[in-house]
């Protein structure tokens, strides 16, 4: 389609000026009630998609190191007391644990999508583990 020149047209009157006056009056009265600006909110799902892209790009560990280390030591206490861990061993355990969880959540998401849902539920995790053969 060919581009056409835009020309300004004169208004033929009507109800537009009255509407404008009403909005101006409303605007003047609004700040006097407190002037609190409504905080900006993104639409549902926008932030989630941004976080997905951010975490898929990154390679850093997502679980904090010290809480994970305490958990490992607490679990190890049940098997043998006075166990010592090299920091590299804790790091390797954390890397493996996070890789496992990411894979499990990917499979869980596929189970939810298969059920025509976008929200993952405990039953999706159970199904993913059962299909993997981790739990009968």
Swiss-Prot record:
Keywords: Acetylation, Chromosome, DNA-binding, Methylation, Nucleosome core, Nucleus, Phosphoprotein, Ubl conjugation
Annotated stretches, region: Disordered: 1-43
Transmembrane parts of this sequence: none
Subcellular location: Nucleus; Chromosome
SUPFAM superfamilies from the UniProt entry: Histone-fold
Residues modified as N6,N6,N6-trimethyllysine: 5, 28, 37, 80
Residues modified to Phosphoserine: 11
InterPro entries the UniProt entry points to: Histone-fold (IPR009072), Histone_H2A/H2B/H3 (IPR007125), Histone_H3/CENP-A (IPR000164)
Sequence positions bearing N6-acetyllysine: 10, 15, 19, 24, 28, 37, 57, 65
Modification N6,N6-dimethyllysine occurs at: 5, 15, 28, 37, 80
GO cellular component term of the entry, any: nucleus
UniProt PTM: Phosphorylated at Ser-11. This is required for transcriptional activation through TBP recruitment to the promoters. Phosphorylation at Ser-11 also promotes subsequent acetylation at Lys-15. Mono-, di- and trimethylation of Lys-5 by the COMPASS complex activates gene expression by regulating transcription elongation and plays a role in telomere length maintenance. Lys-5 methylation enrichment correlates with transcription levels, and occurs in a 5' to 3' gradient with tri-methyl enrichment at the 5'-end of genes, shifting to di-methyl and then mono-methyl. The COMPASS mediated di and trimethylation of Lys-5 requires histone H2B monoubiquitination. Methylation of Lys-37 by SET2 represses gene expression.
GO-annotated molecular function: DNA binding; protein heterodimerization activity; structural constituent of chromatin
Residue numbers bearing the N6-methyllysine modification: 5, 10, 19, 24, 28, 37, 80
Similarity comment: family membership: Belongs to the histone H3 family.
Subunit: The nucleosome is a histone octamer containing two molecules each of H2A, H2B, H3 and H4 assembled in one H3-H4 heterotetramer and two H2A-H2B heterodimers. The octamer wraps approximately 147 bp of DNA.
Function: Core component of nucleosome. Nucleosomes wrap and compact DNA into chromatin, limiting DNA accessibility to the cellular machineries which require DNA as a template. Histones thereby play a central role in transcription regulation, DNA repair, DNA replication and chromosomal stability. DNA accessibility is regulated via a complex set of post-translational modifications of histones, also called histone code, and nucleosome remodeling.
Protein name, per record: Histone H3.3
Name of the gene: HHT3
């Amino acid at each position: 389609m060919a581009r056409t020149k835009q020309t300004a047209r004169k208004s033929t009157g009507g109800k537009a000026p009255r509407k404008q006056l009403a909005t101006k009056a409303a605007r003047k009265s609004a700040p006097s009630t407190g002037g609190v600006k409504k905080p900006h909110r993104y639409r549902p799902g926008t932030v989630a998609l941004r976080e997905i892209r951010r975490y898929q790009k990154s390679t850093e560990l997502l679980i904090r190191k010290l809480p994970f280390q305490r958990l490992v030591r607490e679990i190890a206490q049940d098997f043998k007391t006075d166990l010592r861990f090299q920091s590299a061993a804790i790091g390797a355990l954390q890397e493996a644990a996070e890789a496992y969880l990411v894979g499990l959540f990917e499979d869980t998401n596929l189970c939810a999508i298969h059920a025509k849902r976008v929200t993952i539920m405990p039953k999706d995790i159970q199904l993913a583990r059962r299909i993997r053969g981790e739990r009968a």
